[in-house]
């Protein structure tokens, strides 16, 4: 939807719950012709509990460096995590909620220890702050790099009207809301992907 609203043709390299800053994904993006690139980083790293804060920054730098090897000047928009209450301040891993399964419903819970964030476990809040800081530092030498806080697409104030049905994934109406907000933020005059 966002691509249609922006009048662009999208190539989607989303990996359905498995986007982990994998080098092969960055190499594919590097080698694929593109006028602009956006990458959303966050939730899969937390709910799979695959990385610690110490490794996160270097992994993001490496991912962006690889993309920039093939697209040194194209607009590159880094999008932080959307709001997800179960993982805002509680690390993963995420798991099926057994009580919900017992009722015939699918819901997710965060099984990590909130105190582990102070020892390097990732939460969405930690990722959001690290991404904002990392992109801000890189922007000094990369004027075509931009950051969009995922809260601007779906934040705490949206949760009451648009709750996550399974505590993790947005429903169809919320996807439309997120797509519309992305299009307005990215493609509007003055936006990081405007004029494509």
Question: Which positions does each model-derived feature cover?
Answer:
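Substrate-gating cap/lid alpha-helix
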Residues: 88-148, 177
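Hydrophobic/aromatic beta-strand patches that form the interior of the parallel beta-sheet core
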Residues: 11, 77, 146-148
């Amino acid at each position: 939807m966002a691509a249609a609203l922006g009048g662009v043709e999208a190539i989607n390299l989303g990996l359905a719950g498995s986007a982990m800053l994998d080098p092969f994904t960055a190499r594919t993006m590097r080698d694929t012709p593109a006028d602009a690139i956006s990458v959303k980083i966050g939730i899969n790293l937390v709910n799979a509990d695959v990385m610690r804060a110490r490794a996160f920054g270097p992994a993001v730098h490496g991912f962006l460096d690889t993309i920039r090897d093939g697209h040194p000047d194209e607009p590159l928009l880094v999008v932080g995590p959307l709001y997800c209450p179960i993982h805002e301040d509680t690390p993963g891993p995420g798991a099926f909620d057994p009580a919900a399964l017992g009722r015939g419903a699918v819901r997710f819970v965060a099984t990590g220890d909130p105190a582990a964030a102070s020892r390097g476990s990732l939460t969405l809040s930690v990722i959001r702050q690290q991404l904002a800081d990392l992109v801000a530092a890189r922007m000094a030498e990369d004027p075509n790099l931009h950051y969009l806080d995922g809260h601007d697409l779906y934040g705490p104030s949206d949760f009451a009207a648009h709750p996550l049905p399974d505590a993790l994934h947005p429903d169809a109406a919320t996807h439309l809301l997120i797509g519309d907000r992305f299009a307005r933020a990215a493609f509007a005059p003055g936006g990081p992907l405007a004029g494509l």
